[in-house]
């Protein structure tokens, strides 16, 4: 049946470890982790309705609200909200998913608030199995960042990724991943780039989800940073890259 989730969360103070000259502190560092234990005054309420069906489509709706406590100066207190819709369809040969999100006074998270900022995100992603051995994954994404008070960083971001994969057996597979991204700024031109990666992989099962995995890869790409070069006042805006290496991936 339909399920409803709701939660309240608080953000803790960030902490950047620094060496201290005070010899009374045995460790001589200000903190030992990436965050402290204090409340920094930023809160969020999150909610999600899921397990809904619209014919063959699975539907999820979520809403998040961010606000500040008195720990934040009155002049800096700000509210933010975010709403999203996820539509997905699963069959024997794969899955397709559409994600739509609108944010007010925030972008990716209602913790990090910016006055008069609106952000829109939309993506289409999925995977398809032609056979058990031949599969492909893909993603199309769009992101619109619009700050009504400061338009110097306003931009539209377009991205596309496709990854055909062939599994020779339960251990060995070959993947070819191609990606393209363009960031179109309202001021100062755009940045764009592409990347192509060929990898030979060793894993414990047949499928892209199996880990741990040992990967040997070669990656080539090019980035044309016209916007960044204009902002920084540099003449060189194009970067070429070729990388060869190996990596080990694992998750639990």
Report the location of each language-model feature.
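Outer-membrane beta-barrel "beta-signal"
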Residues: 198, 210, 236-252
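A contiguous, mid-protein "functional segment" used to position or interact
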Residues: 192-194, 198-199, 213, 217-221
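Short Gly/Pro-enriched loop/turn and capping motifs at secondary-structure junctions
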Residues: 181-185, 205, 220-225
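Detector for outer-membrane/organellar transmembrane beta-barrel domains
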Residues: 45-185, 192-196
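Internal helix-turn-beta structural module
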Residues: 215-233
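Outer membrane beta-barrel
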Residues: 1-63, 218-223
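Outer-membrane beta-barrel biogenesis signature
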Residues: 204-215
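Extracellular loop and loop/strand-boundary signature of outer-membrane beta-barrel proteins
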Residues: 18-36, 71-73, 109-112, 147-150, ...
């Amino acid at each position: 049946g339909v399920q409803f989730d709701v939660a309240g969360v608080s953000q803790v103070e960030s902490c950047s470890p620094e060496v201290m000259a005070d010899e009374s502190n045995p460790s001589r560092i200000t903190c030992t982790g990436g965050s402290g234990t204090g409340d920094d005054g930023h809160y969020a309420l999150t909610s999600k309705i899921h397990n809904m069906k619209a014919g063959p489509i699975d539907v999820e709706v979520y809403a998040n609200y961010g606000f500040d406590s008195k720990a934040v100066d009155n002049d800096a207190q700000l509210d933010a909200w975010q709403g999203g819709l996820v539509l997905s369809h699963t069959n024997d040969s794969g899955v397709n998913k559409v994600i739509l999100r609108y944010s007010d006074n925030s972008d990716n998270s209602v913790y990090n608030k910016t006055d008069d900022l609106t952000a829109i995100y939309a993506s289409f992603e999925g995977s398809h199995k032609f056979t058990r051995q031949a599969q492909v994954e893909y993603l199309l994404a769009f992101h619109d960042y619009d700050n009504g008070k400061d338009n110097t960083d306003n931009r539209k971001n377009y991205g596309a990724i496709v990854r055909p994969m062939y599994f020779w057996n339960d251990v060995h597979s070959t993947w070819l991943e191609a990606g393209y991204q363009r960031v179109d700024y309202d001021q100062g031109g755009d940045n764009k780039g592409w990347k192509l990666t060929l990898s030979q992989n060793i894993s414990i099962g047949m499928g892209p989800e199996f880990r741990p995995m040992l990967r040997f890869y070669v990656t080539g790409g090019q980035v044309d940073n016209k916007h960044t070069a204009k902002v920084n006042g540099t003449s060189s805006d194009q970067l070429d890259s070729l990388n060869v290496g190996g990596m080990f991936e694992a998750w639990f």
